[in-house]
Every structure is written in structure tokens, then in C-alpha cells.
């Protein structure tokens, strides 16, 4: 009889192993239809609980084998025991298939076979896993099952704490919605509908059956209370609402509060087990509107637009600063050009408003005079050699001598020393050279004062400013304007119109003076070029005269 019953139970076991994934896929499909997210990993605590019950039941059966050999029981009772042990073909047609059973419903098949013997002990609450446990093995068999369950239940509180720490903070809201759809109350207990049979186990040896008989799970301290009528628990193996006879209840996601110690499956840390809700028990939290979804793309676009605007504002500010600095640099460059291009060092201020310190020093200009023999048309060289002729005036000018003038003066001194030893025929050339040098020195000495006098004459001939006609009571204004200096007291006595006229007149004078300055600079460059050419010619003539003098000096002793 033992082998036949095992063969009969083998087919439901295979169906459970193969149908586990079918049930999971069916549950996922139903959840998708009802817009409920389900995480298969959240079922691990209950699955582990079912596995612990299965192992305990198998060990209990192994312990009952020697007892059955000592006191054999009728075939019908043994058949009822094994048929009531595990029921693997119990499936739910409701919207929420029960994963937590893992194919186990203690006493589901035995309920129909032993319903005729439910007259003697209908109100019994003892832990009786099957009908034969009481009749064949005495109360010690029930204690053996309890001890086996204690062995397998000891590590579960540790696993329970770990699962609570990992899953309770993350899946608080989602698990609450899911549990509420499956019929859970606010305290974590599954609700029972009218007509629902949640826990069925076998009665005593007379065949009596209790409709509300359950198997208690261990308390947090590990002790069992099998005779506690208030502790309606089934070792975590609870069948929730949704049997074939029950109508399908539509589900809706409801957010509800859950104690911090509770976890998935309705287990409470205070009680340590699963409880069943009476038909009229349980209150529901009113439905709350879900939080609006975040539009991340629009948010990113908005942030990018803000960054782009900020960058544009920075670029505009930088462009303004650059334009302001460029204007300042342009004005400064114009002033430097005007200062470097001043015609007279100590002339009047009508040609330039800068000091004469901006002009390059004379030694720096004379330093590039050696390049004149290579290219005397160079403007930079000609500008720096403007005062080369002044070096020849040793008596009236304080400027240092240029290299070329030093050479010419050294040649003249050497000629004067050799003049005594030369013949009278050579005196004509040397005398002529000295005479030309003296005339050049006199002309250079008179050039600077004559230039100053010419500038004064041009200043007197310059037309008066039209401001003098507008301000007859202030005749000194025109003179102050010519000198580029106005007193604050004079400006306070003027009206806005008069000040605007003065400003316009100053702008017009600046433009005219700039044009005149450009013309004078061009003339100066031409004169510098001519001067450089004349200096080169003088240098060549001096060398030629020296060579001729040496040649004639060599011929004289030969004669």
C-alpha cells in the first residue's frame, strides 16, 4: 500500500514542479491587466516557509514508519493519512493565485474523505496533521511533528529579520497595494470571504473534522502553543480568498500603512505568524491619488536652456568689457602714435597733447644709423637718424655725435695734423673740406631756431575759434581753447548750449589737427630719407678723399 500511494502522489508532485512557472506567468499576466507591478523575489520568504513545512512533514513521516510496522493500521486509514498529507493539485481561479502554498494544502483532499466521520470531535483544536496520527501513534506522534517543526523553525527568525531589513523599506508601498488586493487587512492579516475555506486538516481517529482548526507557528521565543484557540495560524501556509466557488473580486491599488515590523505575507514581528481576518473584519484606507510622474526630458531641456541663457549673458558681458578695453587701447595707441610722431620735441601743444618723453631717445635713433649703408630708404632707420646732422655742430648743440659724424670729425682732425707735413698743392682740398664742414655746422645751428620761428608765425596766422564770436563777454575763452585749458569757473558760467558748441568746436579742431599731423609726418619722413642719402654720400666722398690723399702721399716720397 505504501508504494501505491507514493506512485499516486508522484503525479501531483510533477504537476507542481512543472506548473510553478505556469502559475507565475498567469499571475504576471493578471497583474499587467490590472496595472499592478509584481516582484517574484518578494515571494521568497513564504516559499522558504513552505519548504520548511515540507521537510518537517517528510521527517515526521519517516519517524512514523517504525510505529506503523509495530501497530499496522487498516488500509483505508493509511490511505487517508497520505492523501491528507500533501495536496499538489489545488489551484485558484481567482485573480490572485496563491504562491505561498507552493502546492501544499494540508488536509484538502482528506476533507472530503473524512467528512462522514466529523461527529465525535468537531470542536477540537489540537494539532492533528492527519487522521491516523491520533489513532495509530498516540499523543507522542503529534509531539514528534511539533519537535520536527521546532527544528526547522529555529533559523527562520534570523531569515525573517534579514528579509525585513532588505525588502520592507523598498517595497513598502507596492507590497501594501498587492497585499490589499489579495485581501489583507491593515494589521497584516489576510482577509477571508464568506464561504472561503482557508485551512483544512484532518480530525482525530473517529474521523471528526473541525472547520477552524489550524496549526500554530512558533512564537518569537521558539515555543509552541498548540492549544491556544486565539492563535489562528497555519505555519505560514495560508490559503487566501479565491477558491473556485468564490467570485472574482476586482483589484485596485490602494496605499495603506503597515507597521515597521511587518513584512510580505502578513507576518507581524509581535505575533510571529499569519492570522486570518473574519468575514466582517478589517478597514481600508481611503484611496489616495498617485503622485504625478516626473517629465525628466522636459526638466533636462529646461536646465539646458537656463545654462545657455546664462552663458549668453556672460558672453555679452565679456564682449562689452572687451569692446570697452579695445576702445581704450585704440585711444592709447593713437596717443602713442601722436607722441612718437611729434615734429618738434619742445614745440607747442597744438601738434600733440602728450609729453615729449614718449619720443624715442636720440641715442636709440642713432644706434640704427649703421644700417643706412645697406638700405637708406628704411623708414624706421630714417626716423631714428633725424638728428644725425645736429651731431656735427660741436659748439652750439649738446647732442652726442653720430658714428658717421664722429668718423668725419676724426678724419678732419687727422687731416689737420697731417696738414703741416703735406705739400702746398694738397692744401686746396683740405681747405675746401674744412670750409664745407664749417658751413654745414652753421646751417644746422640755425635750423632749429628758424623752425621755431616758422611755427610761431603759423600759429599767429591760424584762424580764431568760432567760440569767441559766441562768447563776446569772455574774450579769454578763445585763448584758453587754443591752449587746451579751461577753468571750472568759466564752465560754470556757461549754458548747456554754449558748452555743446565748445565740444563740437574741439572735435572739429581735433580732426583738422590730425590731418595736418599726418601731412607733416609724411614730409618729415621724406626729409629724413633725403638726409640719410646725403649722409651716405658724404661718407663715401670722405673715404674717397682719404684714399686719394694716401695715394698722393705715397707718390710724393717716390719723386
From Swiss-Prot:
Listed InterPro entries = IQCJ-SCHIP1_N (IPR029362), SCHIP_1 (IPR039045), SCHIP_1_C (IPR015649)
| Coiled-coil region | 496-530
Domain (IQ): give its ranges.
47-67
Keyword terms, alphabetized: Cell projection, Coiled coil, Cytoplasm
Return the Basic and acidic residues bias intervals: 182-195, 225-234, 381-395
Name a GO CC annotation attached to this entry: node of Ranvier
Detail the disulphide connectivity of this chain as listed in its UniProt entry.
none
Q: Where is the composition biased (Acidic residues)?
A: 167-181, 416-426
- Summarize what gene deletion causes: Mice lacking all isoforms encoded by both Schip1 and Iqcj-Schip1 are fertile and survive as long as wild-type mice. However, they exhibit mild growth delay associated with ataxia and reduced pain sensitivity. They display decreased thickness of the piriform cortex and partial agenesis of the anterior comissure which could be due to impaired axon elongation and guidance. The morphology of nodes of Ranvier is affected but nerves do not exhibit significant electrophysiological characteristic differences.
Where found in the cell? Cell projection, Axon; Cytoplasm
Q: What are the boundaries of the region Disordered?
A: 64-141, 161-295, 312-332, 380-426
Gene Ontology MF terms = ankyrin binding; calmodulin binding; transmembrane transporter binding
Please note every region of biased composition (Polar residues): 88-97, 314-327, 396-407
Biological process, per Gene Ontology? axon ensheathment; negative regulation of cytoskeleton organization
- Give positions of region: Required for interaction with ankyrins: 415-559
Cite the record's Low complexity compositional bias ranges: 76-87, 108-141, 198-212
Q: How does it assemble?
A: Homooligomer (via coiled coil domain). Interacts (via IQ domain) with calmodulin; the interaction is direct and lost in presence of calcium. Interacts with ANK3 (via ANK repeats); required for its localization at axon initial segments (AIS) and nodes of Ranvier. Interacts with SPTBN4. Interacts with KCNQ2 and KCNQ3.
Summarizing the function annotation, the protein's role is: May play a role in action potential conduction in myelinated cells through the organization of molecular complexes at nodes of Ranvier and axon initial segments. May also play a role in axon outgrowth and guidance.
The protein's name: IQCJ-SCHIP1 readthrough transcript protein
Organism expressing this protein natively: Mus musculus
Quote the gene name from the UniProt entry.
Iqcj-Schip1
Amino acid at each position: 500500500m505504501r508504494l501505491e500511494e507514493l506512485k499516486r502522489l508522484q503525479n501531483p508532485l510533477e504537476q507542481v514542479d512543472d506548473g510553478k512557472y505556469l502559475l507565475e506567468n498567469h499571475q504576471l499576466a493578471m497583474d499587467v491587466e490590472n496595472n499592478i507591478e509584481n516582484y517574484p523575489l518578494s515571494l521568497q520568504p513564504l516559499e522558504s516557509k513552505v519548504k520548511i513545512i515540507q521537510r518537517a512533514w517528510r521527517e515526521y513521516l519517516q519517524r512514523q514508519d517504525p510505529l506503523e510496522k509495530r501497530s499496522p493500521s487498516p488500509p483505508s486509514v493509511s490511505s487517508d493519512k497520505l492523501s491528507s498529507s500533501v495536496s499538489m493539485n489545488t489551484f485558484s481561479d481567482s485573480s490572485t493565485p496563491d504562491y505561498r502554498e507552493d502546492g501544499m494544502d494540508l488536509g484538502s483532499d482528506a476533507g472530503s474523505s473524512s467528512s462522514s466521520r466529523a461527529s465525535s470531535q468537531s470542536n477540537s483544536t489540537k494539532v492533528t496533521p492527519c487522521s491516523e496520527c491520533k489513532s495509530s501513534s498516540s499523543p507522542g506522534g503529534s509531539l514528534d511533528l511539533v519537535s520536527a517543526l521546532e527544528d526547522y523553525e529555529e533559523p527562520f527568525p534570523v531569515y525573517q529579520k534579514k528579509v525585513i531589513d532588505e525588502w520592507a523599506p523598498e517595497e513598502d508601498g507596492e507590497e501594501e497595494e498587492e497585499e490589499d488586493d489579495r485581501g489583507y487587512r491593515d494589521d497584516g492579516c489576510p482577509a477571508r470571504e464568506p464561504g472561503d475555506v482557508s485551512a483544512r486538516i484532518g480530525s482525530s481517529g473517529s474521523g471528526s473534522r473541525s472547520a477552524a482548526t489550524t496549526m500554530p507557528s512558533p512564537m518569537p521565543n521558539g515555543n509552541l502553543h498548540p492549544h491556544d484557540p486565539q492563535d489562528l495560524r497555519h505555519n505560514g501556509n495560508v490559503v487566501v480568498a479565491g477558491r473556485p466557488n468564490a467570485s472574482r473580486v476586482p483589484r485596485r491599488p490602494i496605499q495603506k500603512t503597515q507597521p515597521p515590523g511587518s513584512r510580505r505575507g502578513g507576518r507581524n514581528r509581535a505575533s510571529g505568524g499569519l492570522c486570518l481576518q473574519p468575514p466582517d473584519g478589517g478597514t481600508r484606507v481611503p484611496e489616495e491619488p498617485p503622485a504625478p510622474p516626473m517629465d525628466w526630458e522636459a526638466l533636462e531641456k529646461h536646465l539646458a536652456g537656463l545654462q545657455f541663457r546664462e552663458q549668453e549673458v556672460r558672453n555679452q558681458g565679456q564682449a562689452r568689457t572687451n569692446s570697452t578695453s579695445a576702445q581704450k587701447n585704440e585711444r592709447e595707441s593713437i596717443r602713442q602714435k601722436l607722441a612718437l610722431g611729434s615734429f618738434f620735441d619742445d614745440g607747442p601743444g597744438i601738434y600733440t597733447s602728450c609729453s615729449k618723453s614718449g619720443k624715442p631717445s636720440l641715442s636709440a635713433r642713432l644706434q640704427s644709423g649703421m644700417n643706412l649703408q645697406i638700405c637708406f630708404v628704411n623708414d624706421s632707420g630714417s626716423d631714428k637718424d633725424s638728428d644725425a646732422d645736429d651731431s656735427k655742430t660741436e659748439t652750439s648743440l649738446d647732442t652726442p655725435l653720430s658714428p658717421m659724424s664722429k668718423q668725419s670729425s676724426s678724419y678732419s682732425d687727422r687731416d689737420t695734423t697731417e696738414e703741416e707735413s703735406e705739400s702746398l698743392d694738397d692744401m686746396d682740398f683740405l681747405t675746401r673740406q674744412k670750409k664745407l664742414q664749417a658751413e654745414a655746422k652753421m646751417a644746422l645751428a640755425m635750423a632749429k631756431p628758424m623752425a621755431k620761428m616758422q611755427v610761431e608765425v603759423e600759429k599767429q596766422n591760424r584762424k580764431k575759434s568760432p567760440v569767441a564770436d559766441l562768447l563776446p563777454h569772455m574774450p579769454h575763452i578763445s585763448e584758453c581753447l587754443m591752449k587746451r585749458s579751461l577753468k571750472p569757473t568759466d564752465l560754470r558760467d556757461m549754458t548747456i548750449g554754449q558748452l555743446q558748441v565748445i565740444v563740437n568746436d574741439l572735435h572739429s579742431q581735433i580732426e583738422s589737427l590730425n590731418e595736418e599731423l599726418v601731412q607733416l609726418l609724411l614730409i618729415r619722413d621724406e626729409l629724413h630719407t633725403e638726409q640719410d642719402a646725403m649722409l651716405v654720400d658724404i661718407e663715401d666722398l670722405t673715404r674717397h678723399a682719404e684714399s686719394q690723399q694716401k695715394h698722393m702721399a705715397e707718390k710724393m716720397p717716390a719723386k
